[in-house]
Amino acid sequence: GAKVFYVMGYNSRFSILSDIEIMQLNEVVTRTVKSYNDPDCVTIVADPLHCSTQTSIDFAKHAEMIGADVISLIFREKVYFEEQVYNHYKEVSDNCNIGILIHEMPLNNGIPGQPPQIDWSLELLDKIADLENVIAIKEDAKKDEYTDKVSRKLCDRLAVITSGYGMKQWMKFTPHVHSWLSGSGGFNPAIEVDFYEAWLANDIDKCNDIIENVELPFNTIKDRFGWHLGIKSAMHVMGVMSRQERMPLQQLPDNDFKNLEKMMEEISNRSPYLVRRTK
């Protein structure tokens, strides 16, 4: 089954949760996972999408208190110079005793007349990687050349997680990328476990079969309906969770949802992994 549980800010709808609700969610996930007493299970919780450095420190201390293993820190404030980003991570690192994961995605540029988003420089990531409590990075730029440079630069110091086209993307960059984000594994963790075991056994045909018949077809849903609404609606179809949303987010319109149901049925017919759950 699944071993690493990551409460991610966007997937977990942090933008429409209060800080107290985010802490409650972090705690519920952590205590639920830890209740199984499996030493191999890891919980990664997160701070709010937009907050002060002090709030990030408060969340890091709370994560430590509830027994989480790692806190994922995102930086969504406008950036005017790189030292601003470094100082944020350093301040949190200096004031907590929990592992820190860098949620690296394009930064919001505060300089007018410049590109609205900018990538983290390798020099900046190199400095942050040397901070005492920083142990991992979620590489979320979704640019192959950049991902390759970042993973090669940091793989000997940090656990590197890639995002976007999970298993297919991971195969491109292994051994410099240690793990990938699981989308299709949300329906059945065996998808990801079997893929990894096939990789270790050098059964590349099986790896490609899982990618071709599960991951890539599911990505057509993401591309058509959007990742966050698409995956939640698909999980509703498979009996995993409700597709209900909190406004201003709203669930897919009924016609779109019916089309998504048909697409999920087609994927299920191609793969033994996707079996609808029953209560």
Question: What is each model feature region?
Answer:
Residues A2, H176, N188-K279:
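C-terminal alpha-helical cap/extension of soluble enzyme domains
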Residues V29, A63, V92, I137, ...:
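Conserved, mostly hydrophobic/aromatic
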Residues I102-E215, N219-F225:
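Catalytic alpha/beta core domains of metabolic enzymes, predominantly
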Residues G1-D119, P248-Q250, R270-T278:
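Active-site beta->alpha loop and helix N-cap motifs at the rims of alpha/beta catalytic domains
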Residues E21, L25, T55, F59, ...:
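General structural feature for long, well-ordered alpha-helical segments within catalytic domains
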Residues V7, T162, V237:
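Short glycine/serine/threonine-biased micro-segments
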